[in-house]
């Protein structure tokens, strides 16, 4: 039908053109004696007739008073041009309809549309300005909406916010309500027919399906767009017109808010089923009020749908700011009477028109009779301008088009019954009286009105996103370039002129030339002026280049079905017709139809999920919201075309060609040569693969999980303990090396680097980048001087120069170790062994060293080894110098290569004084850069184990308690105590693998011979209670002697003259401050180690029973709890006593056997252990003041609150031997600062400890009762006697936290029946 077919151009016209309605809008055919819509009005008396100016070259074409700019839309039977009114300079849209393409019924609908548009004068409805008609053509001049369709706006910008959608929807409602009050039903409301002006106000266009209705009477014509059509239309029932519009309004609102259709389907039947079901999805972002409104508009029963009055009063419509314009328009609609309310005439506009030379009486008559001629058009345009600009700046009236009375067929019929003149033109030529080409006068300002158009940027944006529903231009509507070149004597045509300029100016009133004289040749005569006949592409496609619009021809389902039946069955014309496109002359910068090129819109158009891709050059990839199914026949044809020219056939042809090329007989020589090359290539590939495998095993190019081979080849080191924690080959590490454990930030402490090795009171020297290492500063100290405190601060360790020295673990009995120290007192036990590289001496020192650690430790060997093993093994051994860490972490067996002289000559960089041959090598420690290069020239390799990775997440540098923890205290937070998952700086796995490989080659023969003997010696002494016998001798040792114990080497070496000099922590930094302002050595504030690791046995109150004889001497940094108030606790800032511990607390906590100095716990020579700090950090928090320990995400979580104001007894929860995996997980409940992976890893270590303690440690569980009792006694402030006997039980407090941890990881004892996975890691 014409209305439907032309509606495509109408929508485009509206969108780009101001919405000139769907099809041509014009008056019914003028009956004799009745006024008709004048095309070109005959010259009226008094009308100015200025002479035509001389020819000045090609100028834009004119239609009446309108100068054509460009084509902005095409439909099946209509073309829409944008034009500029010559008088008012207003932009208009002119829809040109070919009547010859319309049947009788559709022509009547177009007349009805024009009649209805004349009745509608609303700010949100496209205005009809003028109607011109010839014998073949109908010209509808309508308002131009420069903002385009809301459909395009949604495609370009996505769905609207409800506030914006509410504003648009209110304008739509006022316009539809106005129509209903006029008894007009639109019946084709959809996003494509909602246009936007320059100010983004709504303009409803396309009244091609509109009709008049009588309230209470039902309509029965099926029309509209299927996705927007009400269910009663799909059912074929008679329907209430306004209720159909209300359903469509509900769909429109859904589209505005959601950017999608509520009902859509790939075929019309699917769409019909969905609409009839009435079910649609409500997105999560839609408000409840909006959902309520939509649901009550999209009701299947028309009688239950909301009315327009109810919609206007709905809660959602009332939201937001007040809208006086909406209220006013609704009030006007309600006050409308049946007769049309005529606005009073604007006298200013009438005077302006009279000044222009237009007869006032003629204008008044035109307005009263609704002639919609150029008089009424000028009046309406001037009224619109006056409303917008409050001014009427008009130029001189151009030469008025004259009615042309052609000699033969053309006649002018002036109907006296009305003022309008109807000009009958039997054949519309390219140049006709109404379309004469007139050059504008030089006095006219051709610039358009300001405000009429959006900014150029907006226009470019609009043009770039606009897509039209029509296809290529009809060749019959455009003049091709070759024809233009054939015209003799005329310059090139301006491409912007849609009509060829044949004569510079033809004034038909002066010379009524015959038609053949107007044109040099007859080539330009179109025998049929079928401007509106759609190209074959469109007729066959039925969809246009964008797929069928909702209301394009196919919107009438019967007509659409007929078109489908008439389509050819052959190859699709979608491809075959494209070669005709280049023949069309582009008439402007954007081609004749104004479409942007395909690539310009794809970026924004692909966001539509309902995209139908067809193989046509000009096909837009975005379907309209209202597009139905793609043409099945066209798709079939497309498939046939694909079958004919498919890529499969091309591949087959290529295959045949290859067979022809290479399928023949090949020369034997060539074949043999090819075969040899192939074999060489295979060998080379195989060699490369082998090389890669070898490289991966030695030096993996990228971080990878620890190599199992390295672990398997690694000889068992010191004890069963090391091997019991050995991860089974089937257990992958809990974290891939690419995880945070192997990242290397510049300021995060590595899990096993300087922050790890240092004592809790010390910090990595790397924080002071400009300061020399402590080894360089204090290396030459006198023997009797205690080492100055470590100058390093928090463990933000910078990378230390990598000196890959093989570090061997020296296990000495305590007396041997002390005697080997330069400052060892003469009273030390005779068990000391002279420092010599012999293996036997190394074994003895190994045992004595281990026994020393056992005797001064505070927990069972199993737990101690678990913690230390994980700690040592996860060291980034080749990056962080032990010189940066307090040596309280460095037991002699850990760093045998470090000469451990007396504290006076203490230098972490120097070896402890044991040659490498004296100690068993521990792979992870072999890489510490500060070990003397002489120790080992071949840097060993070691791959970190899963347990290490899990345990050793570094402490975050910005660790804080309730308030900020001082940087000094952060030094106490070694990575294993703050398993927060922070990244750390480590040696890459590649270097680890290399070091391991070299180390294994050196150690295999030497250590395999020593393993069994060491195991036997170690456990024989352990079982015999060697550690217990060491305690009495230690009582007589000087502080210098005991300082040599690496696990006691805290960097806070203070000449404490009073208990207050123990460790200074500034209260303003949220840690309670001891009374002494600064340590004697100016020891920097070291962060208290908030001990979040369950492996650390924190009950420092048990320290006294570990062989400490003197209850009066206290060393707050050793496991033996000291009298000095240095035991750091997690108490709040207001709890200095609970945080730092007082003398009474230290007395409660235990007796230290280091000499008999009550207050000189940190004398010069004293190298206290870090363990009490650990214990108190976690256990001595004041009640209700849980310390916030940040996890790896930066989220604080509280540390364990203390049960007691002072130190909390740990009871069995922390000290009993775990018997099974369940116990291990129970233990994890009390690890506030531990990450889950680390906790599970610890549980694995504890489960290994269970077997260990049962088989090797003589009833550690049995000793726990006494141990706990003693712990309670120490809490009570009682001094403990010598507990050397108890130390033989090796209970949970028998070992310092820095015991040989790395010994634990390389062996899995046969008794351990679970892997790391089973243990929960």
Curated annotation (Swiss-Prot):
SUPFAM superfamilies: Protein kinase-like (PK-like). Residues 1-59, 585-614, 727-772, 894-945, 1256-1289 are annotated as: Disordered. Its main location: cytoplasm. Gene3D superfamilies: Transferase(Phosphotransferase) domain 1. Residues 344-384 form the UBA domain. The active site is at 188 (proton acceptor). Its EC number is 2.7.11.1. Belongs to the protein kinase superfamily. CAMK Ser/Thr protein kinase family. SNF1 subfamily. This is Serine/threonine-protein kinase SIK3. The gene is SIK3.
């Amino acid at each position: 039908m014409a209305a439907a077919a032309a509606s495509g151009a109408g929508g485009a016209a509206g969108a780009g053109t101001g919405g000139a309605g769907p099809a041509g809008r014009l008056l019914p055919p003028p009956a004799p004696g009745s006024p008709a819509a004048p095309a070109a009005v005959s010259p009226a008396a008094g009308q100015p007739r200025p002479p035509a100016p001389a020819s000045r070259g090609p100028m834009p074409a004119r239609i009446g008073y309108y100068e054509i700019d460009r084509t902005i839309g095409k439909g099946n039977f209509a073309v829409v041009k944008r034009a500029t009114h010559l008088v008012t300079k207003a932009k208009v849209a002119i829809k040109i309809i070919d009547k010859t393409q319309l049947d009788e019924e559709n022509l009547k609908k177009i007349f009805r549309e024009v009649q209805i548009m004349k009745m509608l004068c609303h700010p949100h409805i496209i205005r009809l300005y003028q109607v011109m008609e010839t014998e073949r053509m109908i010209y509808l001049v309508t308002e131009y909406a420069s903002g385009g369709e809301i459909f395009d706006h949604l495609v370009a910008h996505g769905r609207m916010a409800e506030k914006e959608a509410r504003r648009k929807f209110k304008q739509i409602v006022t316009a539809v309500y106005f129509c209903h009050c006029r008894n007009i039903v639109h019946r084709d409301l959809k996003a494509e027919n909602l246009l936007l002006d320059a100010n983004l106000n709504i303009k409803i266009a396309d009244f091609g399906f509109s009709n008049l209705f009588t309230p209470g009477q039902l309509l029965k014509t099926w029309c509209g767009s299927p996705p927007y059509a009400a269910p009663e239309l799909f059912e074929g029932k008679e329907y209430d017109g306004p209720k159909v519009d209300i359903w469509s309004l509900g769909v429109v609102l859904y589209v505005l808010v959601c950017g999608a259709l509520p009902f859509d389907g790939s075929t019309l039947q699917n769409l019909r089923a969905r609409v009839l079901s009435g079910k649609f999805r409500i997105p999560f972002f839609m408000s409840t009020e909006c959902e309520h409104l939509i649901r009550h508009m999209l009701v299947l029963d028309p009688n239950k749908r909301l009315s327009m009055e109810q919609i206007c009063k709905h809660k959602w419509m009332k939201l937001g700011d007040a809208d006086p314009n909406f209220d006013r328009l609704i009030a006007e609609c309600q006050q409308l009477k049946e007769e049309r309310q005529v606005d009073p005439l604007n006298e200013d506009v009438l005077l302006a028109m009279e000044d222009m030379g237009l007869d006032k009486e003629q204008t008044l008559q035109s307005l009263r009779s609704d002639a919609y001629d150029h008089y009424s058009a000028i009046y309406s345009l001037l009224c619109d301008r006056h409303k917008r600009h409050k001014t009427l700046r008009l130029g001189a009236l151009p030469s008025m088009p004259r009615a042309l009375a052609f000699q033969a067929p053309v006649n002018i019929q002036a109907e006296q019954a009305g003022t309008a003149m109807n000009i009958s033109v039997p054949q519309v030529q390219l140049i006709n009286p109404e379309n004469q080409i007139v050059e504008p006068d030089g006095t006219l300002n051709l610039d358009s009105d300001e405000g009429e158009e959006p900014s150029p940027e907006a226009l470019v944006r609009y043009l770039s996103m606009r897509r039209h529903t029509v296809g290529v231009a009809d060749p019959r509507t455009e003049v091709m370039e070759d024809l233009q070149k054939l015209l003799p004597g005329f310059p090139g045509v301006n491409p912007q002129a849609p009509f060829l300029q044949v004569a510079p100016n033809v004034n038909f009133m002066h010379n009524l030339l015959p038609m053949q004289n107007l044109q040099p040749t007859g080539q330009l005569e179109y025998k049929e002026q079928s401007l509106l006949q759609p190209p074959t592409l469109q007729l066959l496609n039925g969809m246009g280049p964008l797929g069928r619009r909702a209301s394009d021809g196919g919107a009438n389902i019967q007509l659409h079905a007929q078109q489908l039946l008439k389509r050819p069955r052959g190859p699709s014309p979608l491809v075959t017709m494209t070669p005709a496109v280049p023949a069309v002359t582009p008439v402007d910068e954007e081609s004749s139809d104004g479409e942007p090129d395909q690539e310009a819109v794809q970026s924004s158009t692909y966001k539509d999920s309902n995209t139908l891709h067809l193989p046509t050059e000009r096909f837009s990839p975005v379907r309209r919201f209202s597009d139905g199914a793609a043409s099945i026949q066209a798709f079939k044809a497309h498939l046939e075309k694909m079958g004919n020219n498919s890529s499969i056939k091309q591949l087959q042809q290529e295959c045949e060609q290859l067979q022809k090329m290479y399928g023949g007989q090949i020369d034997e020589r060539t074949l043999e040569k090819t075969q040899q090359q192939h074999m060489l290539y295979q060998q080379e590939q195989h060699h490369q693969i082998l090389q890669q495998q070898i490289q991966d095993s030695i030096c993996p190019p990228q971080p990878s999980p620890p190599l199992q081979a390295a672990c398997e080849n690694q000889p068992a080191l010191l004890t069963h303990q090391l091997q019991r924690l050995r991860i089974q080959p089937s257990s992958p590490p809990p974290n891939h090396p690419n995880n945070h454990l192997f990242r290397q930030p510049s300021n995060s402490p590595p899990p096993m680097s300087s922050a790890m090795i240092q004592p809790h009171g010390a910090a990595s020297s790397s924080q002071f980048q400009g300061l020399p290492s402590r080894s360089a500063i204090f290396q030459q100290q006198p023997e009797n001087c205690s080492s100055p405190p470590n100058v390093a601060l928090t463990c933000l360790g910078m990378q230390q120069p990598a000196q890959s020295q093989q570090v061997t673990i020296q296990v000495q009995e305590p007396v041997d170790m002390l005697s080997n120290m330069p400052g060892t007192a003469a009273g030390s036990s005779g068990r000391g062994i002279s420092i010599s590289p012999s293996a036997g001496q190394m074994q003895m020192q190994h045992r004595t060293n281990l026994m020393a650690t056992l005797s001064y430790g505070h927990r069972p060997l199993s737990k101690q080894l678990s913690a230390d093993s994980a700690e040592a093994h996860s060291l980034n051994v080749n990056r962080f110098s032990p010189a940066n860490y307090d040596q309280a972490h460095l037991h002699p067996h850990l760093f045998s290569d470090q000469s451990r002289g007396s504290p006076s000559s203490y230098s972490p960089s120097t070896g402890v004084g044991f040659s490498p041959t004296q100690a068993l090598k521990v792979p992870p420690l072999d890489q510490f850069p500060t070990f003397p290069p002489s120790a080992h020239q071949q840097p060993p390799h070691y791959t970190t184990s899963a347990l290490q990775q899990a345990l050793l997440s570094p402490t975050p540098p910005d660790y804080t308690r309730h308030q900020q923890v001082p940087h000094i205290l952060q030094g106490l937070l070694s990575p294993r105590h703050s398993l927060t998952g922070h990244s750390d700086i480590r040696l890459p796995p590649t270097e680890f693998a290399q070091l391991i490989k070299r180390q294994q080659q050196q150690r295999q023969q030497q250590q395999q011979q020593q393993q069994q003997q060491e195991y036997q010696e170690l456990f024989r002494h352990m079982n015999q209670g060697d550690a217990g016998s060491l305690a009495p001798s230690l009582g007589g040792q000087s502080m210098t002697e005991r300082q040599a114990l690496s696990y006691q080497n805290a960097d806070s070496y203070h000449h404490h003259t009073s208990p207050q000099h123990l460790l200074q922590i500034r209260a303003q930094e949220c840690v309670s401050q001891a009374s002494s302002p600064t340590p004697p050595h100016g020891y920097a504030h070291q962060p208290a180690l908030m001990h979040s690791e369950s492996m650390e046995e924190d009950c420092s109150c048990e320290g006294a029973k570990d062989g400490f004889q003197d209850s009066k001497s206290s060393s707050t940094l050793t496991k033996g709890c000291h009298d000095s108030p240095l035991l750091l606790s997690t108490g709040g800032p207001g709890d200095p006593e609970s945080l730092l511990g007082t003398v009474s607390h230290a007395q409660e906590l235990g007796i230290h056997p280091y000499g008999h100095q009550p207050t000189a716990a940190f004398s010069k020579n004293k190298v206290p252990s870090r363990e009490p700090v650990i214990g108190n950090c976690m256990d001595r928090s004041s009640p209700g003041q849980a310390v916030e320990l940040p996890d790896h995400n930066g989220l604080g979580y509280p540390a364990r609150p203390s049960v007691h104001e002072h130190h909390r007894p740990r009871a069995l929860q922390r000290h009993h031997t775990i018997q099974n995996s369940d116990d291990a997980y129970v233990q994890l409940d009390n690890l506030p600062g531990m990450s889950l992976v680390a906790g599970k890893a610890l549980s694995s270590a504890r489960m290994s400890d269970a077997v260990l303690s049962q088989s090797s440690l003589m009833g550690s569980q049995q000793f726990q009762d006494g141990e706990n009792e003693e712990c309670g006694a120490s809490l009570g402030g009682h001094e403990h006697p010598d507990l050397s006997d108890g130390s033989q039980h090796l209970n949970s407090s028998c070992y310092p936290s820095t015991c040989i941890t790395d010994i634990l990881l390389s062996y899995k004892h046969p008794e351990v029946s679970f892997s790391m996975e089973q243990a929960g890691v």
